[in-house]
Amino acid sequence: MAAANFGKIQIGIYVEIKRSDGRIHQAMVTSLNEDNESVTVEWIENGDTKGKEIDLESIFSLNPDLAPDEDIEPSPETQPLPAPSAKVNKIVKGRRTVAPVKNDTPARDNRVASSARARPTQLPEQSSSSQQNGTVSGISPVQAAKKEFGPPSRRKSNCVKEVEKLQEKREKRRLQQQELREKRAQDVDATNPNYEIMCMIRDFRGNLDYRPLTTADPIDEHRICVCVRKRPLNRKETLMKDLDVITIPSKDVVMVHEPKQKVDLTRYLENQTFRFDYAFDETAPNEMVYRFTARPLVETIFERGMATCFAYGQTGSGKTHTMGGDFSGKNQDCSKGIYALAARDVFLMLKKPNYKKLELQVYATFFEIYSGKVFDLLNRKTKLRVLEDGKQQVQVVGLQEREVKCVEDVLKLIEIGNSCRTSGQTSANAHSSRSHAVFQIILRRKGKLHGKFSLIDLAGNERGADTSSADRQTRLEGAEINKSLLALKECIRALGRNKPHTPFRASKLTQVLRDSFIGENSRTCMIATISPGMASCENTLNTLRYANRVKELTIDPSAAGDIRPIIHHTPSQIDDLDTQWGVGSSPQRDDLKLLCEQNEEEVSPQLFTFHEAVSQMVEMEEQVVEDHRTVFQESIRWLEDEKALLEMTEEVDYDVDSYATQLEAILDQKIDILTELRDKVKSFRAALQEEEQASKQINPKRPRAV
C-alpha cells in the first residue's frame, strides 16, 4: 500500500518543484522514499547537478495530476494521465546541439493540454460511474461522472487555487516566449550561409535561464582574479554576416558554440562551458568591468602591496579599449579606461584620514616591451636596459617617473604614451598593438617605494603562433609574446601556491614585473577579452583555455588532482636538463628550461630550441650594440690623442721616439678593441643563422600556441 501513496509518480519523470527562493521549475525524480513518504529529485543549474528531498504533499500541490485516487480503486477502463514532458535548462560542458526539430512546439502544447485535465479529486467519481453504468459510447468518464453526480462536493483549497494561478501564468509566459521566438525566426536572414548554425544557437539560447552580472552583485576578494569580457560584433563582422557564437548566461559562466561537421556532412554545435570569477557580456561598460576587477586592488598598494592587472586576448578583442578607454574612430577617450579609473580612485584614497597622514607622493611610468626590448613611452621611446642588482632587485635603468598631482596629469601621460606605442595593421584590426604596454602607478613615502599598481595591456596572443614566419621581425615578435605568456602563467602559478621560486627571468615581461609576483601582499587580476564572431572561434577558445588554466591554479592543490605541481630541481636534475635540452646554464636559461619543461604539452623540444636561440641572439645583440657604443666613444678620444701627436710633429725638434711610442700604443689599443668587436659581430651573425635554422625545425603539428 505504501507504493500506492506515490500515485502516478515514477522514477525518471519530470515534476514541478518549488525552490526556497520561490522559483518554480521542473526536476527529474530519481528515487521514491517509502519510509518518510518523500521523493528525491535532481536538476541541472548553471552546469552543476543539484538535488533535494521533497515530501509528497508538496509534490502533489504543484502536480495535482500525479496525485493518487482517493478511497475507490480505479477501474481498468480509467486511463492514467500521461506524465508531462519538459525540457530542463542546462549548461553542460561538451553538450552537442543537432539541427532543430520542427515539431517541438506541438509536443509542448500536448503537455499543456494534459496538465489542464480534470482534477485528481474527481477521479473516484469517474471510477464509480464506470463501474455502475459501464462505458458510454462517445462520453468520457469525467462527463459521465458529472452527469451522474453533478458538480463535485469538495471545494478547491487555497493552495490548489494558488497553484492553478501559477500554472496559468506559466503557460501564458511560455506562449509569449514562443511568440517571441517565432517573431525572431521571421527576422532571421535565411540567405546567411550559416543559417542552420544560427537557428541551432538561437534554439539553444531559448532554453537558458539568463542571470547576467549586475552592479548589485557582491564583490568577492581574490588574490588571483580571472574574468572574461565579451565585446559586441563590430561593423566588419556584421557586414560579413558573422555569427555571435558566445553566450554568457550568468555572472560567471561563458559558453562557446563551436560549429562542427560530421562525416556525413551533418552540422552540429559543440557547446563548451567555462567558469570564471566574473563574466561580462557585450553590454557591460568599462566602469562595471573596473568595479569587479581592478578597483578591489587599489587599496592593496596603500597597504604596502603590489597589484597587477592584465588585459589578455587576441588582436581586436578589446584589450586596449578596456585598459585605455573607449574608441571613436582612431580617437580614444582615455578618461573611461581602467588606467584613468584606477588613478581616480588612488587620488580619492589619498584624501582618507588614515592615508593622508602618510604624506604619500604619486608617480607614474609608461613603457612598452617589444621583441624583448624595453622602451620608455614618456621619453620619446628611449631604449632602456633591464638589470638585476646585487640584492636581486630588477632595475629598469633610465626609466622616467613623472610625478602626478591629479587625474588630468595621468590622462596627459596616457595620451603621450599611446601616441607612440608600437602598432601595425593586421587582418583583425587596422590599428593593432604589437607590444606589451605597462602603465604603473607608484606610491612613494619620503622617496622610498610604498606600493605599486601595474596595469598591462598585453600584445595579441595569436601573434605567439608566428614563430615559423619567413620574416625575422615577425618571428621575434611571436617568440617573445609566446614566451612571455608562458612565463606569465607560471609566475601566477607560483604566486597562487606561495612557492619559493618564481621563473620571472624566463621573459622580459615577467622580469620587469618581478616584484608583482614576490611577497605575501601581492594580488593579480586577469581580464581575458574575447571576440564573439564565429571566424574568431579558435582564438577565442585558446584565450578561454589559457584563462581557465590560470584560474585552475588558484584552487586548493588537494582538490586539483590533474594539476601538476611546481617542480623544484636539484643541481643534478639541472644537469640532466642540460643534457636533454642541449644548452648551457645561466639564470635566464635555467628559468626558460624549467618553464618549457612544465609546459611540455605546449612546447616541443624544437620550439624550446628556437626560444633559446632567440634569447641568445637578443643577449648577443645587446652586447654588440653596447660594445659598438663603447668603441665609438673611444674613437673620439683616439682622435683627440692623434690630433695632439700630429700637432707635436709640427714642432722643429719634436721627440721622434715619444711620437712613435704613443702612436704604436694607440694603434695597439685600436686593434685589440676593434678585433674583439669584430669577433662578437661574427658570433652575432652566427646566432642569427642559428635562429633562422631553428625556426625551420619547428614541428608544424606542435600544440596550439597559448
Curated annotation (Swiss-Prot):
Record's function text: Plus end-directed microtubule-dependent motor required for normal brain development. May regulate microtubule dynamics during axonal growth. Required for normal progression through mitosis. Required for normal congress of chromosomes at the metaphase plate. Required for normal spindle dynamics during mitosis. Promotes spindle turnover. Implicated in formation of bipolar mitotic spindles. Has microtubule depolymerization activity.
Biased composition (Basic and acidic residues): 159-187
Species of origin: Gallus gallus (Chicken)
Similarity annotation: Belongs to the TRAFAC class myosin-kinesin ATPase superfamily. Kinesin family. MCAK/KIF2 subfamily.
Protein name, UniProt field: Kinesin-like protein KIF2A
Record GO biological process: cell differentiation; cell division; microtubule-based movement; mitotic spindle organization; nervous system development
Location of region: Disordered: 64-187
PROSITE patterns associated with the record: KINESIN_MOTOR_1, KINESIN_MOTOR_2
Main subcellular location of this protein, as a coarse class: cytoplasm
Positions of the Kinesin motor domain: 223-553
Compositional bias ranges of the Polar residues kind: 123-140
Coiled coil spans: 154-187, 662-699
Positions bound to ATP: G313, Q314, T315, G316, S317, G318, K319, T320
Keywords carried by this UniProt record: ATP-binding, Cell cycle, Cell division, Coiled coil, Cytoplasm, Cytoskeleton, Developmental protein, Differentiation, Microtubule, Mitosis, Motor protein, Neurogenesis, Nucleotide-binding, Phosphoprotein
Cellular component annotations (GO), alphabetically ordered: centrosome; cytoplasm; kinesin complex; microtubule; spindle; spindle pole
SMART domains membership: KISc
Subcellular localization, as worded in the UniProt entry: Cytoplasm; Cytoplasm, Cytoskeleton, Microtubule organizing center, Centrosome; Cytoplasm, Cytoskeleton, Spindle pole; Cytoplasm, Cytoskeleton, Spindle
Entry GO MF terms: ATP binding; ATP hydrolysis activity; microtubule binding; microtubule motor activity
